[in-house]
Design a protein with these regions (language model features):
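Structural signature of the two symmetry-related core transmembrane helices
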Residues: 76-90, 168, 267-281, 360
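Paired small-residue
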Residues: 99-107, 290-298
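Cytoplasmic helix-loop-helix junction between adjacent transmembrane helices
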Residues: 104-140
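Intracellular juxtamembrane helix-capping segments at the cytosolic ends
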Residues: 114-127, 304-318
């Protein structure tokens, strides 16, 4: 048993470290972009479109990354995706033009799809019993890094070249860790694509969970900094509050595998959706920053829990050779939500509690749907 653990650790250590470094850089960049638009002579109204362009790229990338990963392997696919992402950041600085920024963020989304498909399928390979724990480690690294990145807004700021230099430096460290770190990986070409018939038989609650995760997280990443700024919160506290959202997402990850032992995954998504509804309701009732901080942390727990639960539900009892394809389908579903989320949420941004109202309605509908599906699934089990 000890020898097995010794083999497993280096296999996941390198991609997790690289993901953590990427997450710090990406988390910082996500807040810098909407806040720094005026610095580059661009209008604040571009923020939602830039966010949607990124997630449109994620959607496109989700459809095309499986063959690349199978052809060149997980390590090189990860490195290539990071290098393309670095290129898109440099383009933003050199060409401060709205159309070029939209194109650059579209390409950035495609490259990030490569990162997600690569790391998720890398960690989902292996024994099924430890899959939830590996996904928890993946999500914890992703969200923990993103939370640290959000703090960069207050510590480093958003002006000048230092933020961009810091972001690119972190991404280069991620590239070097993949180039020189020791790890094994799933064999290239060792996966099959799911047919349309097989995709249609994937768990519907898992697909909806991924879509809602995109609808909520896309809006949070793209518009929450502006929502907080519109409330009169200063820039340093905006970064801290965004970090709290992501820390909530990080804190919930160890809870998900543990709760999955006792509760069905569909019911679990309903419970976390209800937690988000309650947290958002409190932001309507109490306006002070302390209450806002606590409830943003709870909102982070609720929204960031949905994706790992959904993807684990989708891959439950799935043959190993279909895992890359299944993660691509789940990422595609997430991306659909992520593209629509910022644009739909932007329609309510001019109203009081605009973004919060959008998130409230999204999570309330999800809670009701998941409860219905949970009861339906339990009845089917009892009748069989």
């Amino acid at each position: 048993m000890n020898s097995t653990l010794a083999i497993a650790k280096p296999r996941i250590a390198v991609p997790v470290i690289a993901l953590f470094l990427y997450a710090i850089a990406s988390g910082y960049l996500m807040s810098v972009i909407p806040l720094a638009l005026p610095q580059y002579g661009l209008d604040h109204s571009l923020a939602s479109w830039v966010a949607s362009a990124f997630y449109a790229g994620l959607l496109i990338g989700a459809m095309m990354m499986e063959p690349l990963v199978n052809r060149i392997g997980h390590r090189f696919a990860f490195i290539a995706s990071l290098l393309v992402f670095i290129f898109t950041i440099a383009v933003l600085v050199v060409f401060p033009v709205a159309a070029i920024w939209l194109a650059a963020r579209l390409l950035a989304g495609i490259s990030v799809a490569g990162i997600f498909v690569t790391v998720e399928s890398w960690l989902l390979h292996g024994d099924e019993a430890g899959r939830a724990k590996r996904l928890g480690l993946y999500m914890g690294s992703l969200y923990g890094g993103a939370a640290l990145g959000q703090l960069g807004v207050g510590v480093i700021g958003i002006e000048g070249m230092l933020p961009i230099a810091t972001i690119i430096g972190l991404l280069m460290l991620a590239v070097f860790s993949l180039m020189f770190g020791h790890s094994d990986q799933p064999e290239s070409g060792h996966s099959d694509s799911l047919s349309l018939k097989q995709i249609s038989k994937l768990n519907q609650a898992a697909l909806i969970g991924c879509i809602v995760s995109g609808l909520t997280l896309g809006a949070i990443y793209g518009l929450m900094p502006l929502e907080l700024s519109n409330r009169g919160i200063d820039r340093e506290n905006v970064g801290s509050l965004m970090a709290l959202v992501i820390l909530g997402g990080m804190a919930v990850q160890p809870m998900v595998p543990w709760l999955s032992k006792y509760l069905g995954r569909t019911l679990l998504m309903a419970m976390f959706s209800l937690l988000g509804v309650g947290a958002l309701a409190m932001t309507f009732l109490q306006k002070d920053i302390a209450t806002l901080a606590v409830n943003l942390f709870l909102l982070g727990m609720a929204t960031f829990a949905l994706y790992p639960i959904a993807i684990n539900l989708a891959c439950d009892k799935l043959e190993t050779r279909y895992i890359v394809s299944a993660t691509q389908v789940m990422l595609f579903s997430y991306s659909i939500g992520s593209v629509l989320g910022p644009v739909v949420a932007d329609l309510s941004m001019g109203e009081n509690n605009g973004l919060m109202s959008y998130l409230f309605l999204s999570l309330l509908a999800t809670c009701i749907y998941m409860l219905i599906m949970s009861v339906k699934g339990r009845r089917e089990v009892m009748m069989s």
